[in-house]
């Protein structure tokens, strides 16, 4: 929807093909930077998070204040529809359906074949397209059919239950606090969460481990926090990409964006900001390809994204690969997060969407604190 909006507002003829019948499974967190960069009204926020609580394997809590700012929470059904409507208002044609395959007409122009309507089993329709932006999720059919090495993507499998939020705050739940559990019974290699969304709350978990019971984990978490008494509204599951794909375009007419390109932050699973950023960069790449009449411009989407965010993804990937591997390391990871410099730099990076280079002494302190935990010189 972001890519469609960007191109439509520039006067391009755009078809937005979307599986509008499906609510995207998502924790729903957005940084204030997203509201600014993409002109999103604060009225779409259903909650403002002022604190994050990290719970270690031994049950030790670290409460991290957000500081100056907040983490916004959105409901994806409302938020995504607003994005689609904005694209349509800018001039994009909307159509509900699902991508089936790409074909080519006799003159070499691509033709997108899709199922029409609110089901994958609808009648097949087709439309000619000079360029195609594939933003059809982690298991993207556009990527699998059109992009080299798309099968190299790896995923965390996530599951959450949307429940009615408790009427009152308690030790186990607060309407303005996100809780993140680093405990192997809840996730052997990722984390479990409780994310308030105003009237509703997302309770979920993720894991790379096949056979791990995600539903069982959420049931245990709900029972431990008393949220098993809350009414369940719906349940959802979806894969979360672990790494950006190595190639985002086919060198001819297709470029990827969002989960289809693998742009979900390692360690945190944050994806909305990066999906919208990828959508804008894909639109820029298509605009450049149209202007220059060269499909080489499509490669600029990945180059620009990785130049802006690749370092953050690299750091988060290292963090996940090391600190999430067992409960001993996760206990130490949570202990490190008690450090005020770690807290401040983490949320500064989250808010601004870049690594913070200020206060070099803080980085030195954090480095030696990490080193102490890695070598076992520090105690938890």
List each model region and its residues.
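Glycine-rich FAD pyrophosphate-binding loop
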Residues: 2-26
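Short, hinge-like loop/turn segments at secondary-structure boundaries
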Residues: 31-35, 151-152
């Amino acid at each position: 929807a972001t890519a469609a909006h960007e191109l439509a507002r520039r006067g391009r003829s755009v078809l937005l093909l979307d599986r509008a019948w499906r609510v995207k499974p998502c924790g729903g967190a957005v940084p204030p930077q997203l509201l600014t960069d993409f002109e999103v009204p604060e009225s779409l926020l259903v909650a403002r998070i002022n604190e994050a609580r990290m719970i270690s394997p031994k049950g030790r809590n670290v409460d991290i204040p957000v500081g100056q700012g907040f983490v916004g929470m959105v409901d994806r059904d409302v938020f995504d529809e607003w994005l689609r409507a904005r694209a349509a208002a800018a001039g994009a044609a909307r159509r509900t359906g699902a991508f089936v395959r790409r074909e080519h007409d006799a003159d070499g122009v691509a033709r997108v074949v899709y199922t029409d309507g609110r089901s994958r089993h609808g009648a097949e329709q087709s439309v000619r397209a000079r360029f195609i932006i594939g933003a059809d999720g982690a298991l993207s059919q556009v990527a699998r059919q059109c992009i080299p090495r798309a099968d190299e993507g790896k995923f965390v499998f996530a599951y959450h239950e949307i429940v009615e939020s408790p009427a009152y705050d308690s030790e186990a739940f607060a309407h303005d606090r996100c809780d993140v559990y680093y405990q192997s019974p809840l996730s052997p290699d990722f984390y479990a969460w409780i994310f308030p969304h105003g009237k509703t709350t997302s309770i979920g978990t993720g894991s790379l481990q096949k056979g791990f019971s995600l539903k069982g984990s959420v049931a245990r978490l709900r029972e431990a926090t008393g949220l098993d008494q809350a009414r369940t509204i719906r349940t959802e599951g979806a894969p979360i990409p672990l790494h950006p794909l190595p190639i985002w375009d086919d060198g001819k007419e297709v470029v990827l964006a969002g989960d289809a390109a693998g742009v979900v932050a390692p360690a945190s699973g944050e994806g909305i900001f990066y999906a919208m950023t990828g959508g804008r960069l894909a639109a820029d790449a298509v605009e450049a390809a149209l202007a220059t009449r060269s499909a080489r411009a499509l490669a600029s989407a990945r180059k620009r994204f990785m130049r802006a965010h690749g370092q953050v993804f690299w750091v988060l990937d290292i963090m996940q690969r090391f600190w999430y591997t067992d409960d001993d390391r996760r206990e130490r990871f949570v202990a490190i997060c008690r450090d005020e410099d770690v807290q401040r730099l983490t949320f500064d990076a989250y808010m601004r969407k870049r690594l913070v280079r200020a206060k070099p002494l803080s980085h030195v302190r954090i480095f030696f604190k990490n080193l102490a935990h890695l070598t076992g010189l520090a105690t938890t």
